[in-house]
Amino acid sequence: MPRSFLVKSKKAHSYHQPRSPGPDYSLRLETVPVPGRADGGAVSAGESKMEPRERLSPESQLTEAPDRASASPNSCEGSVCDPSSEFEDYWRPPSPSVSPASEKSLCRSLDEAQPYTLPFKPYAWSGLAGSDLRHLVQSYRQCSALERSAGLSLFCERGAESGRPAARYGSEQAAGGAGAGQPGSCGAASGATSAGGLGLYGDFAPAAAGLFERPSTAAGRLYQDRGHELHADKSVGVKVESELLCTRLLLGGGSYKCIKCSKVFSTPHGLEVHVRRSHSGTRPFACEMCGKTFGHAVSLEQHKAVHSQERSFDCKICGKSFKRSSTLSTHLLIHSDTRPYPCQYCGKRFHQKSDMKKHTFIHTGEKPHKCQVCGKAFSQSSNLITHSRKHTGFKPFGCDLCGKGFQRKVDLRRHRETQHGLK
């Protein structure tokens, strides 16, 4: 094997040796022919005064390229190689054959130079009329609005197909005339909402009204109230008719109105309890002591305190004691002589609203409470309860001195006064 292959070359490569532009470097640049020129000559004297860094800068390349292309007879207009087309002769970094010193000098010139912009052609907006520009802006805004409401529209469309609440509410709203939307259309997307955010719930109000409507066959309907199952049955004489049970949901203000007596409630539960207690005749909670019935379990618990002997509520004016706080509050109206409830027929005033309603039955002759045994009717429920004790023989009031029982409390008081001399 020759020794020339074993000995490393002592001659350094040309690209490892630093090159400094000598006095003849600019002369060689002047004599370099430019391929884009028509005469194929060298660089002119005016261009020779420009430094090499400036001739290689991006600004010089971007500005001089169209000039040289326009002066060239060999230029191919309309083709890809056309310098005046979109594919202009942009500046590119030097090749790796340049020395490291020249690369450093070029990079320094690029860092010092200002950032350049690509020569994009400006869009001719002046070619469009004012109406065309407005049409473009409006179409863009409509597309943005459709993108924002895409999820809501998708929910409404799926609700119309699968029977979701949105489609069901929309169809009932369209059928009831509350809104102009079709079944499955979303009222929130159309922006038809009332002040205060009530429109969002007002759209669904007709559907909620069906919760309180009872058909004529509501005799076997099962009611739920605080864990108690209330079964309405015609066999026990419960009055359940649609004209008494039908209620209406008002759209304004979120109030619930009974169409039988026009009483307004703030919650649907309050309206349901009112209909069951006042109009349906369903009073399933009965007292074991006196047989009095109540429409609510809480009312029965409060009533049981009447049969006990404990009187924990005392009047500070006269010293009279009561078993219930509500009875004491009613008693205090006697001392203040406050009678806020007048009769609409004779003008007589009462302390309690219930006393005023009982009094009005005298003028109207109405007797809504009827005995199930003999058919006798009474204007007050208390009179019906006292009358029913004649059929059952129940005597809840007993004398503590002789043990004699009575059906009415007034009879016990009279017995104590006449027989025992007590007041």
Curated annotation (Swiss-Prot):
Source species, domain of life: Eukaryota
UniProt source species: Rattus norvegicus (Rat)
Region (Required for interaction with RELA): 141-258
Lineage, opening ranks: Eukaryota, Metazoa, Chordata, Craniata, Vertebrata
InterPro entries to which the protein is assigned, alphabetical: C2H2-ZF_Transcription_Reg, Znf_C2H2_sf, Znf_C2H2_type
Keyword set, alphabetical order: DNA-binding, Metal-binding, Nucleus, Phosphoprotein, Repeat, Transcription, Transcription regulation, Ubl conjugation, Zinc, Zinc-finger
Protein name, per record: Zinc finger protein Gfi-1
Zinc finger motifs (C2H2-type), residue ranges: 256-279, 285-307, 313-335, 341-363, 369-391, 397-420
Comment on protein domains: Zinc fingers 3,4 and 5 are required for DNA binding and for interaction with SPI1.
GO biological process per UniProt: cell fate commitment; cell fate specification; cellular response to lipopolysaccharide; DNA damage response; inner ear auditory receptor cell differentiation; inner ear morphogenesis; mechanosensory behavior; negative regulation of cell fate specification
Annotated compartments: Nucleus
